[in-house]
Amino acid sequence: MNIQEEIKKRRTFAIISHPDAGKTTITEQLLYFGGEIREAGTVKGKKTGTFAKSDWMDIEKQRGISVTSSVMQFDYDGKRVNILDTPGHEDFSEDTYRTLMAVDAAVMVVDSAKGIEAQTKKLFEVVKHRGIPVFTFMNKLDRDGREPLDLLQELEEILGIASYPMNWPIGMGKAFEGLYDLYNQRLELYKGDERFASLEDGDKLFGSNPFYEQVKDDIELLNEAGNEFSEEAILAGELTPVFFGSALTNFGVQTFLEIFLKFAPEPHGHKKTDGEIVDPYDKDFSGFVFKIQANMDPRHRDRIAFVRIVSGEFERGMSVNLPRTGKGAKLSNVTQFMAESRENVTNAVSGDIIGVYDTGTYQVGDTLTVGKNKFEFEPLPTFTPEIFMKVSAKNVMKQKSFHKGIEQLVQEGAVQLYKNYQTGEYMLGAVGQLQFEVFKHRMEGEYNAEVVMTPMGKKTVRWIKPEDLDERMSSSRNILAKDRFDQPVFLFENDFALRWFADKYPDVELEEKM
Protein backbone atom coordinates (compact mmCIF):
# COMPACT_ATOMS: atom_id res chain seq x y z
CA MET A 1 0.00 0.00 0.00
CA ASN A 2 1.37 3.42 -0.97
CA ILE A 3 0.64 5.47 2.18
CA GLN A 4 0.86 8.86 0.47
CA GLU A 5 -1.61 7.82 -2.23
CA GLU A 6 -3.99 6.44 0.41
CA ILE A 7 -3.89 9.67 2.45
CA LYS A 8 -4.62 11.72 -0.68
CA LYS A 9 -7.83 9.71 -1.19
CA ARG A 10 -9.27 10.53 2.25
CA ARG A 11 -12.21 12.93 2.63
CA THR A 12 -13.43 13.26 6.22
CA PHE A 13 -16.44 15.45 6.94
CA ALA A 14 -19.41 15.96 9.27
CA ILE A 15 -23.01 16.65 8.33
CA ILE A 16 -24.65 19.41 10.37
CA SER A 17 -28.24 20.63 10.41
CA HIS A 18 -31.26 21.61 12.46
CA PRO A 19 -33.51 18.61 13.30
CA ASP A 20 -35.79 17.49 10.46
CA ALA A 21 -33.85 19.34 7.74
CA GLY A 22 -33.11 15.95 6.14
CA LYS A 23 -29.64 15.11 7.45
CA THR A 24 -30.49 11.45 8.05
CA THR A 25 -31.98 11.06 4.57
CA ILE A 26 -29.01 12.62 2.78
CA THR A 27 -26.63 10.44 4.84
CA GLU A 28 -28.54 7.35 3.68
CA GLN A 29 -28.42 8.49 0.05
CA LEU A 30 -24.64 9.05 0.25
CA LEU A 31 -24.21 5.54 1.69
CA TYR A 32 -26.39 4.23 -1.12
CA PHE A 33 -24.08 5.78 -3.74
CA GLY A 34 -21.10 4.37 -1.84
CA GLY A 35 -22.59 0.88 -2.23
CA GLU A 36 -22.94 0.41 1.54
CA ILE A 37 -26.72 0.12 1.42
CA ARG A 38 -29.02 -1.36 -1.19
CA GLU A 39 -31.72 1.25 -0.65
CA ALA A 40 -32.09 4.11 1.79
CA GLY A 41 -33.01 2.71 5.20
CA THR A 42 -31.26 -0.67 4.85
CA VAL A 43 -27.64 -1.22 5.73
CA LYS A 44 -25.63 -3.97 4.09
CA GLY A 45 -23.34 -6.15 6.21
CA LYS A 46 -19.94 -6.11 4.49
CA LYS A 47 -19.14 -9.79 4.90
CA THR A 48 -22.52 -11.49 4.74
CA GLY A 49 -24.26 -9.41 2.12
CA THR A 50 -27.34 -9.48 4.36
CA PHE A 51 -29.46 -6.42 4.92
CA ALA A 52 -30.54 -4.89 8.18
CA LYS A 53 -32.66 -1.86 8.98
CA SER A 54 -30.32 0.96 9.96
CA ASP A 55 -31.53 1.58 13.49
CA TRP A 56 -28.85 4.21 14.04
CA MET A 57 -30.88 6.41 11.71
CA ASP A 58 -33.81 6.53 14.11
CA ILE A 59 -32.05 8.91 16.45
CA GLU A 60 -35.13 10.23 18.24
CA LYS A 61 -36.43 6.80 19.31
CA GLN A 62 -33.08 5.42 20.38
CA ARG A 63 -31.78 7.20 23.45
CA GLY A 64 -28.89 4.77 23.59
CA ILE A 65 -25.49 4.40 21.98
CA SER A 66 -26.74 5.38 18.54
CA VAL A 67 -27.62 8.93 19.59
CA THR A 68 -23.91 9.67 19.75
CA SER A 69 -22.10 10.58 16.57
CA SER A 70 -21.82 7.61 14.22
CA VAL A 71 -18.89 7.17 11.87
CA MET A 72 -19.49 5.72 8.42
CA GLN A 73 -17.01 4.88 5.71
CA PHE A 74 -17.37 4.12 2.01
CA ASP A 75 -15.47 4.35 -1.28
CA TYR A 76 -16.67 6.46 -4.19
CA ASP A 77 -14.98 7.55 -7.39
CA GLY A 78 -11.49 6.69 -6.16
CA LYS A 79 -11.95 8.46 -2.80
CA ARG A 80 -12.29 6.95 0.71
CA VAL A 81 -15.09 8.89 2.38
CA ASN A 82 -15.47 9.15 6.18
CA ILE A 83 -18.78 10.68 7.29
CA LEU A 84 -19.26 11.69 10.91
CA ASP A 85 -22.94 12.05 11.71
CA THR A 86 -23.86 14.59 14.38
CA PRO A 87 -27.00 14.08 16.49
CA GLY A 88 -29.88 16.53 16.23
CA HIS A 89 -31.47 18.94 18.68
CA GLU A 90 -32.82 16.81 21.53
CA ASP A 91 -29.68 14.74 21.55
CA PHE A 92 -27.37 17.70 21.34
CA SER A 93 -24.30 17.58 23.52
CA GLU A 94 -20.63 18.41 23.67
CA ASP A 95 -20.05 15.21 21.70
CA THR A 96 -21.45 17.01 18.69
CA TYR A 97 -19.07 19.94 19.11
CA ARG A 98 -16.05 17.67 19.61
CA THR A 99 -16.90 15.65 16.52
CA LEU A 100 -16.42 18.85 14.52
CA MET A 101 -12.81 18.97 15.80
CA ALA A 102 -12.05 15.70 13.99
CA VAL A 103 -13.17 16.59 10.46
CA ASP A 104 -11.65 18.50 7.54
CA ALA A 105 -14.94 19.87 6.13
CA ALA A 106 -18.64 20.18 6.95
CA VAL A 107 -21.79 19.69 4.91
CA MET A 108 -24.63 21.92 6.10
CA VAL A 109 -28.13 20.66 5.26
CA VAL A 110 -30.82 23.38 5.21
CA ASP A 111 -34.60 22.94 4.85
CA SER A 112 -35.39 25.25 1.93
CA ALA A 113 -38.82 26.05 3.41
CA LYS A 114 -37.37 27.17 6.76
CA GLY A 115 -33.93 28.59 5.98
CA ILE A 116 -31.24 28.90 8.66
CA GLU A 117 -32.51 27.61 12.02
CA ALA A 118 -31.13 27.87 15.57
CA GLN A 119 -29.21 24.59 15.77
CA THR A 120 -27.62 25.09 12.35
CA LYS A 121 -26.38 28.50 13.49
CA LYS A 122 -24.81 27.04 16.67
CA LEU A 123 -23.02 24.28 14.78
CA PHE A 124 -21.91 26.65 12.05
CA GLU A 125 -20.22 28.89 14.67
CA VAL A 126 -18.03 25.95 15.77
CA VAL A 127 -17.15 25.12 12.16
CA LYS A 128 -16.39 28.77 11.42
CA HIS A 129 -14.12 28.97 14.47
CA ARG A 130 -12.09 26.09 13.00
CA GLY A 131 -11.87 27.76 9.57
CA ILE A 132 -12.77 24.58 7.67
CA PRO A 133 -14.75 24.53 4.39
CA VAL A 134 -18.56 24.37 4.51
CA PHE A 135 -20.65 22.98 1.65
CA THR A 136 -24.39 23.79 1.75
CA PHE A 137 -27.20 21.52 0.56
CA MET A 138 -30.58 23.29 0.29
CA ASN A 139 -32.96 20.38 0.75
CA LYS A 140 -36.63 19.51 0.19
CA LEU A 141 -37.17 21.10 -3.22
CA ASP A 142 -39.88 18.49 -3.77
CA ARG A 143 -41.95 20.74 -1.46
CA ASP A 144 -42.75 24.43 -1.74
CA GLY A 145 -40.06 26.53 -0.11
CA ARG A 146 -38.51 29.97 0.05
CA GLU A 147 -37.09 31.86 -2.91
CA PRO A 148 -33.52 30.69 -3.69
CA LEU A 149 -32.18 34.27 -3.67
CA ASP A 150 -33.65 34.77 -0.16
CA LEU A 151 -31.91 31.61 1.05
CA LEU A 152 -28.53 32.83 -0.25
CA GLN A 153 -29.12 36.19 1.40
CA GLU A 154 -29.80 34.44 4.72
CA LEU A 155 -26.47 32.60 4.54
CA GLU A 156 -24.71 35.94 4.23
CA GLU A 157 -26.81 37.88 6.77
CA ILE A 158 -27.30 35.27 9.52
CA LEU A 159 -24.10 33.20 9.18
CA GLY A 160 -21.85 35.84 7.69
CA ILE A 161 -20.52 33.58 4.93
CA ALA A 162 -20.44 34.41 1.22
CA SER A 163 -22.11 31.87 -1.07
CA TYR A 164 -21.84 30.63 -4.64
CA PRO A 165 -24.69 28.56 -6.16
CA MET A 166 -23.45 25.48 -8.04
CA ASN A 167 -26.95 24.87 -9.40
CA TRP A 168 -30.34 26.63 -9.39
CA PRO A 169 -33.84 25.17 -8.98
CA ILE A 170 -36.36 25.28 -11.82
CA GLY A 171 -39.59 25.63 -9.82
CA MET A 172 -40.27 23.75 -6.57
CA GLY A 173 -42.93 21.59 -4.93
CA LYS A 174 -45.45 20.27 -7.46
CA ALA A 175 -43.98 22.60 -10.10
CA PHE A 176 -40.40 21.32 -9.59
CA GLU A 177 -38.83 20.57 -12.99
CA GLY A 178 -35.15 20.11 -12.13
CA LEU A 179 -31.90 22.01 -11.74
CA TYR A 180 -29.95 24.42 -13.90
CA ASP A 181 -26.43 23.10 -13.23
CA LEU A 182 -24.15 26.15 -13.35
CA TYR A 183 -21.00 24.20 -12.55
CA ASN A 184 -21.40 21.43 -15.16
CA GLN A 185 -23.26 23.71 -17.59
CA ARG A 186 -26.19 21.34 -18.12
CA LEU A 187 -29.79 20.74 -17.03
CA GLU A 188 -30.61 18.00 -14.51
CA LEU A 189 -34.18 16.83 -15.12
CA TYR A 190 -36.59 15.83 -12.35
CA LYS A 191 -39.23 14.26 -14.58
CA GLY A 192 -39.10 11.90 -17.56
CA ASP A 193 -36.59 9.20 -18.57
CA GLU A 194 -33.59 11.41 -19.38
CA ARG A 195 -31.47 12.52 -16.41
CA PHE A 196 -29.54 15.32 -18.13
CA ALA A 197 -30.01 17.70 -21.05
CA SER A 198 -27.83 20.41 -22.59
CA LEU A 199 -28.50 24.07 -21.78
CA GLU A 200 -29.29 24.61 -25.48
CA ASP A 201 -32.27 22.27 -25.11
CA GLY A 202 -33.71 24.30 -22.21
CA ASP A 203 -36.06 26.48 -24.26
CA LYS A 204 -37.29 23.48 -26.24
CA LEU A 205 -37.90 21.44 -23.05
CA PHE A 206 -39.54 24.11 -20.94
CA GLY A 207 -41.05 26.36 -23.62
CA SER A 208 -42.43 29.46 -21.96
CA ASN A 209 -42.55 27.89 -18.47
CA PRO A 210 -42.54 30.96 -16.15
CA PHE A 211 -40.24 29.16 -13.67
CA TYR A 212 -37.61 28.60 -16.36
CA GLU A 213 -37.86 32.26 -17.42
CA GLN A 214 -37.36 33.21 -13.74
CA VAL A 215 -34.28 30.96 -13.54
CA LYS A 216 -32.70 32.70 -16.55
CA ASP A 217 -33.38 36.11 -14.93
CA ASP A 218 -31.94 34.94 -11.58
CA ILE A 219 -28.79 33.58 -13.24
CA GLU A 220 -28.27 36.81 -15.15
CA LEU A 221 -28.55 38.69 -11.85
CA LEU A 222 -26.10 36.30 -10.14
CA ASN A 223 -23.60 36.68 -12.98
CA GLU A 224 -23.72 40.45 -12.60
CA ALA A 225 -23.99 40.89 -8.84
CA GLY A 226 -23.15 37.51 -7.25
CA ASN A 227 -19.89 36.33 -5.69
CA GLU A 228 -17.09 34.96 -7.82
CA PHE A 229 -16.25 31.27 -7.60
CA SER A 230 -12.95 30.75 -5.76
CA GLU A 231 -11.55 27.40 -4.68
CA GLU A 232 -9.15 29.24 -2.37
CA ALA A 233 -12.05 31.00 -0.60
CA ILE A 234 -13.92 27.66 -0.26
CA LEU A 235 -10.91 25.96 1.36
CA ALA A 236 -10.45 28.91 3.72
CA GLY A 237 -14.08 28.60 4.87
CA GLU A 238 -14.94 32.05 3.46
CA LEU A 239 -17.22 30.93 0.59
CA THR A 240 -19.79 28.14 0.72
CA PRO A 241 -20.77 26.38 -2.52
CA VAL A 242 -24.57 25.93 -2.48
CA PHE A 243 -26.36 22.94 -3.99
CA PHE A 244 -30.14 22.61 -4.34
CA GLY A 245 -31.89 19.24 -4.36
CA SER A 246 -34.20 16.76 -2.67
CA ALA A 247 -32.66 14.05 -0.48
CA LEU A 248 -36.00 12.27 -0.10
CA THR A 249 -36.41 11.74 -3.85
CA ASN A 250 -32.62 11.34 -4.23
CA PHE A 251 -32.46 14.23 -6.69
CA GLY A 252 -29.30 16.34 -6.96
CA VAL A 253 -27.52 14.25 -4.30
CA GLN A 254 -25.13 12.38 -6.61
CA THR A 255 -24.18 15.58 -8.45
CA PHE A 256 -23.53 17.16 -5.04
CA LEU A 257 -21.37 14.21 -3.91
CA GLU A 258 -19.23 14.27 -7.07
CA ILE A 259 -18.56 18.02 -6.93
CA PHE A 260 -18.06 17.92 -3.14
CA LEU A 261 -15.37 15.21 -3.47
CA LYS A 262 -13.64 17.30 -6.12
CA PHE A 263 -13.32 20.38 -3.88
CA ALA A 264 -13.29 19.00 -0.32
CA PRO A 265 -9.81 19.06 1.20
CA GLU A 266 -7.60 16.05 1.82
CA PRO A 267 -6.56 15.50 5.49
CA HIS A 268 -5.34 18.55 7.42
CA GLY A 269 -2.38 18.75 9.74
CA HIS A 270 -3.03 19.36 13.44
CA LYS A 271 -1.44 21.82 15.84
CA LYS A 272 0.71 20.71 18.79
CA THR A 273 0.88 22.56 22.10
CA ASP A 274 4.12 24.26 20.95
CA GLY A 275 2.27 25.70 17.93
CA GLU A 276 4.00 23.46 15.38
CA ILE A 277 1.74 21.63 12.89
CA VAL A 278 2.02 17.86 12.48
CA ASP A 279 1.96 17.07 8.76
CA PRO A 280 -0.52 14.33 7.74
CA TYR A 281 2.23 12.86 5.52
CA ASP A 282 4.68 12.41 8.44
CA LYS A 283 5.61 8.73 8.51
CA ASP A 284 5.21 8.44 12.31
CA PHE A 285 1.71 7.60 13.53
CA SER A 286 -0.10 10.17 15.68
CA GLY A 287 -3.73 10.83 16.56
CA PHE A 288 -6.07 12.22 19.20
CA VAL A 289 -9.14 10.97 21.07
CA PHE A 290 -12.09 13.24 20.26
CA LYS A 291 -14.81 11.23 21.96
CA ILE A 292 -15.35 8.24 24.21
CA GLN A 293 -18.51 6.27 23.75
CA ALA A 294 -19.63 3.88 26.46
CA ASN A 295 -22.23 1.34 25.48
CA MET A 296 -25.49 1.79 27.30
CA ASP A 297 -26.35 -1.87 26.73
CA PRO A 298 -25.41 -3.45 30.09
CA ARG A 299 -24.62 -6.77 28.35
CA HIS A 300 -21.66 -5.13 26.57
CA ARG A 301 -19.89 -2.94 29.10
CA ASP A 302 -17.41 -1.72 26.48
CA ARG A 303 -16.01 1.74 26.03
CA ILE A 304 -14.66 2.86 22.69
CA ALA A 305 -12.24 5.75 22.27
CA PHE A 306 -12.70 7.39 18.86
CA VAL A 307 -9.33 8.42 17.43
CA ARG A 308 -8.73 10.74 14.49
CA ILE A 309 -5.48 9.69 12.84
CA VAL A 310 -3.44 12.86 12.21
CA SER A 311 -0.31 11.39 10.62
CA GLY A 312 1.23 8.15 9.45
CA GLU A 313 -0.33 4.71 9.44
CA PHE A 314 -2.05 2.64 12.11
CA GLU A 315 -1.16 -1.07 12.09
CA ARG A 316 -2.92 -3.55 14.34
CA GLY A 317 -0.91 -4.50 17.40
CA MET A 318 1.26 -1.38 17.32
CA SER A 319 2.42 0.21 20.59
CA VAL A 320 1.70 3.88 21.26
CA ASN A 321 2.68 6.49 23.84
CA LEU A 322 0.10 8.31 25.93
CA PRO A 323 2.00 11.52 26.84
CA ARG A 324 -0.64 12.61 29.41
CA THR A 325 0.15 9.62 31.65
CA GLY A 326 3.69 8.92 30.44
CA LYS A 327 2.64 5.30 29.86
CA GLY A 328 2.25 3.19 26.73
CA ALA A 329 -0.61 1.16 25.28
CA LYS A 330 -1.01 -1.56 22.64
CA LEU A 331 -3.60 -1.01 19.90
CA SER A 332 -4.71 -4.57 19.20
CA ASN A 333 -8.51 -4.46 19.35
CA VAL A 334 -9.41 -1.69 16.91
CA THR A 335 -12.53 -1.21 14.79
CA GLN A 336 -13.93 0.90 11.98
CA PHE A 337 -17.64 1.52 11.67
CA MET A 338 -20.44 1.20 9.19
CA ALA A 339 -23.67 2.22 10.89
CA GLU A 340 -24.36 -0.42 13.54
CA SER A 341 -21.75 -2.90 12.29
CA ARG A 342 -18.16 -2.84 13.46
CA GLU A 343 -15.31 -4.22 11.39
CA ASN A 344 -11.96 -5.17 12.90
CA VAL A 345 -9.34 -3.09 11.15
CA THR A 346 -5.73 -4.05 10.44
CA ASN A 347 -4.52 -0.71 9.12
CA ALA A 348 -5.73 2.85 8.57
CA VAL A 349 -4.06 6.12 7.59
CA SER A 350 -4.14 9.85 8.26
CA GLY A 351 -7.69 11.20 7.92
CA ASP A 352 -9.32 7.94 9.05
CA ILE A 353 -11.30 7.48 12.27
CA ILE A 354 -10.68 4.32 14.30
CA GLY A 355 -12.36 2.99 17.43
CA VAL A 356 -10.00 1.71 20.14
CA TYR A 357 -11.48 -0.53 22.84
CA ASP A 358 -10.87 1.24 26.12
CA THR A 359 -10.66 -0.24 29.60
CA GLY A 360 -10.37 3.18 31.22
CA THR A 361 -6.97 4.14 29.76
CA TYR A 362 -8.06 7.11 27.63
CA GLN A 363 -9.60 10.53 28.17
CA VAL A 364 -11.17 12.87 25.65
CA GLY A 365 -8.38 15.05 24.23
CA ASP A 366 -5.61 12.45 24.70
CA THR A 367 -2.77 12.41 22.16
CA LEU A 368 -1.34 9.11 20.86
CA THR A 369 2.21 9.04 19.45
CA VAL A 370 4.87 6.43 18.62
CA GLY A 371 8.60 5.94 19.22
CA LYS A 372 10.42 8.85 20.79
CA ASN A 373 7.62 11.31 19.99
CA LYS A 374 6.06 12.50 23.26
CA PHE A 375 4.33 15.71 22.10
CA GLU A 376 0.69 16.59 22.75
CA PHE A 377 -1.84 18.15 20.39
CA GLU A 378 -3.59 21.36 21.37
CA PRO A 379 -6.37 20.65 23.88
CA LEU A 380 -9.89 20.32 22.51
CA PRO A 381 -11.94 23.43 23.28
CA THR A 382 -14.16 23.50 26.35
CA PHE A 383 -17.72 24.49 25.58
CA THR A 384 -19.71 26.67 27.91
CA PRO A 385 -22.60 24.72 29.48
CA GLU A 386 -26.05 26.27 29.31
CA ILE A 387 -28.12 24.23 31.76
CA PHE A 388 -27.31 23.08 35.29
CA MET A 389 -28.38 20.52 37.89
CA LYS A 390 -27.41 20.04 41.52
CA VAL A 391 -26.38 16.42 42.10
CA SER A 392 -25.90 14.30 45.23
CA ALA A 393 -25.83 10.62 46.20
CA LYS A 394 -29.24 9.22 47.16
CA ASN A 395 -27.65 6.74 49.56
CA VAL A 396 -25.01 8.14 51.93
CA MET A 397 -23.47 4.65 52.16
CA LYS A 398 -22.72 4.73 48.42
CA GLN A 399 -20.51 7.85 48.50
CA LYS A 400 -17.50 5.90 47.22
CA SER A 401 -19.29 4.64 44.07
CA PHE A 402 -20.86 8.09 43.63
CA HIS A 403 -17.45 9.83 43.61
CA LYS A 404 -15.87 7.18 41.36
CA GLY A 405 -18.74 7.46 38.86
CA ILE A 406 -18.66 11.24 38.77
CA GLU A 407 -14.88 11.30 38.36
CA GLN A 408 -14.92 8.85 35.44
CA LEU A 409 -17.90 10.34 33.62
CA VAL A 410 -16.48 13.85 33.93
CA GLN A 411 -13.09 12.65 32.61
CA GLU A 412 -14.93 11.07 29.69
CA GLY A 413 -16.53 14.42 28.90
CA ALA A 414 -20.12 13.22 29.51
CA VAL A 415 -20.89 16.30 31.65
CA GLN A 416 -18.99 19.19 33.24
CA LEU A 417 -18.55 19.33 37.00
CA TYR A 418 -18.69 22.43 39.20
CA LYS A 419 -18.49 22.81 42.98
CA ASN A 420 -20.25 25.56 44.92
CA TYR A 421 -17.50 27.75 46.40
CA GLN A 422 -19.30 28.23 49.72
CA THR A 423 -21.21 24.98 50.30
CA GLY A 424 -19.12 22.43 48.36
CA GLU A 425 -22.28 21.15 46.63
CA TYR A 426 -21.75 19.40 43.30
CA MET A 427 -23.33 20.96 40.22
CA LEU A 428 -23.37 19.50 36.72
CA GLY A 429 -23.31 21.62 33.57
CA ALA A 430 -24.34 20.50 30.08
CA VAL A 431 -25.21 21.98 26.70
CA GLY A 432 -28.20 19.65 26.27
CA GLN A 433 -30.74 17.89 28.52
CA LEU A 434 -29.79 14.46 27.19
CA GLN A 435 -26.38 14.70 28.86
CA PHE A 436 -28.10 14.66 32.29
CA GLU A 437 -30.30 11.68 31.34
CA VAL A 438 -27.29 9.70 30.13
CA PHE A 439 -25.33 10.65 33.29
CA LYS A 440 -28.14 9.45 35.63
CA HIS A 441 -28.65 6.24 33.63
CA ARG A 442 -24.96 5.40 33.68
CA MET A 443 -24.40 6.31 37.35
CA GLU A 444 -27.13 3.83 38.28
CA GLY A 445 -26.33 1.15 35.67
CA GLU A 446 -22.53 1.18 35.68
CA TYR A 447 -21.59 2.45 39.14
CA ASN A 448 -24.61 1.27 41.15
CA ALA A 449 -24.96 4.81 42.53
CA GLU A 450 -28.45 6.31 42.58
CA VAL A 451 -28.40 10.09 42.35
CA VAL A 452 -30.70 12.95 43.28
CA MET A 453 -30.73 15.66 40.62
CA THR A 454 -32.31 19.07 41.14
CA PRO A 455 -32.74 21.38 38.14
CA MET A 456 -31.11 24.82 38.43
CA GLY A 457 -32.27 25.99 35.00
CA LYS A 458 -30.22 27.96 32.50
CA LYS A 459 -27.20 29.96 33.63
CA THR A 460 -24.82 32.36 31.92
CA VAL A 461 -21.30 31.16 32.73
CA ARG A 462 -18.18 33.31 32.99
CA TRP A 463 -14.71 32.49 34.31
CA ILE A 464 -12.84 34.99 36.51
CA LYS A 465 -9.09 35.26 37.17
CA PRO A 466 -8.25 34.05 40.72
CA GLU A 467 -6.40 37.32 41.43
CA ASP A 468 -9.55 39.35 40.64
CA LEU A 469 -11.80 37.26 42.86
CA ASP A 470 -13.47 38.53 46.02
CA GLU A 471 -15.97 36.07 47.53
CA ARG A 472 -18.24 39.02 48.44
CA MET A 473 -18.94 39.44 44.70
CA SER A 474 -21.17 36.37 44.93
CA SER A 475 -24.93 36.70 45.48
CA SER A 476 -28.14 34.74 44.91
CA ARG A 477 -28.10 35.97 41.30
CA ASN A 478 -24.51 34.92 40.57
CA ILE A 479 -23.36 31.69 42.20
CA LEU A 480 -19.61 31.41 42.72
CA ALA A 481 -18.20 27.96 41.90
CA LYS A 482 -15.00 26.11 40.95
CA ASP A 483 -14.69 24.07 37.76
CA ARG A 484 -12.99 20.64 37.70
CA PHE A 485 -9.60 22.35 37.35
CA ASP A 486 -10.31 24.46 40.49
CA GLN A 487 -10.69 27.64 38.43
CA PRO A 488 -13.24 30.14 39.83
CA VAL A 489 -16.37 30.66 37.77
CA PHE A 490 -19.62 32.62 38.15
CA LEU A 491 -23.00 31.14 37.19
CA PHE A 492 -25.19 34.16 36.44
CA GLU A 493 -28.98 33.88 36.65
CA ASN A 494 -29.37 35.59 33.26
CA ASP A 495 -27.77 38.18 30.95
CA PHE A 496 -29.24 41.00 33.03
CA ALA A 497 -27.41 39.75 36.15
CA LEU A 498 -24.19 39.54 34.09
CA ARG A 499 -24.57 43.14 32.87
CA TRP A 500 -25.32 44.33 36.41
CA PHE A 501 -22.12 42.63 37.64
CA ALA A 502 -20.07 44.14 34.78
CA ASP A 503 -21.35 47.63 35.66
CA LYS A 504 -20.60 47.16 39.36
CA TYR A 505 -17.09 45.73 38.78
CA PRO A 506 -15.87 47.42 35.56
CA ASP A 507 -12.21 46.44 36.17
CA VAL A 508 -12.92 42.72 36.52
CA GLU A 509 -12.33 40.73 33.36
CA LEU A 510 -14.75 37.85 32.78
CA GLU A 511 -13.93 35.13 30.26
CA GLU A 512 -16.31 33.13 28.11
CA LYS A 513 -15.43 29.76 26.55
CA MET A 514 -16.82 28.63 23.17
UniProtKB/Swiss-Prot annotation:
Gene3D superfamilies found in the cross-reference section: P-loop containing nucleotide triphosphate hydrolases (3.40.50.300), Peptide chain release factor 3, domain III (3.30.70.3280), Translation factors (2.40.30.10)
GO molecular function, a single term: GTPase activity
Keyword Iron assigned: no
Compartmental location: Cytoplasm
A GO cellular component entry from the record: cytosol
Domain of life: Bacteria
Any GO BP: regulation of translational termination
Keywords: Cytoplasm, GTP-binding, Nucleotide-binding, Protein biosynthesis
Ranges where the tr-type G domain occurs: 8-268
Residues bound to GTP: 17-24, 85-89, 139-142
Primary localisation category: cytoplasm
CDD domains, A to Z: RF3 (cd04169), RF3_III (cd16259)
Function (record text): Increases the formation of ribosomal termination complexes and stimulates activities of RF-1 and RF-2. It binds guanine nucleotides and has strong preference for UGA stop codons. It may interact directly with the ribosome. The stimulation of RF-1 and RF-2 is significantly reduced by GTP and GDP, but not by GMP.
NCBIfam families named among the record's database cross-references: prfC (TIGR00503), PRK00741.1 (NF001964), small_GTP (TIGR00231)
Family from the record: Belongs to the TRAFAC class translation factor GTPase superfamily. Classic translation factor GTPase family. PrfC subfamily.
The protein's name in its UniProt record: Peptide chain release factor 3
Annotated source species: Streptococcus pneumoniae (strain 70585)
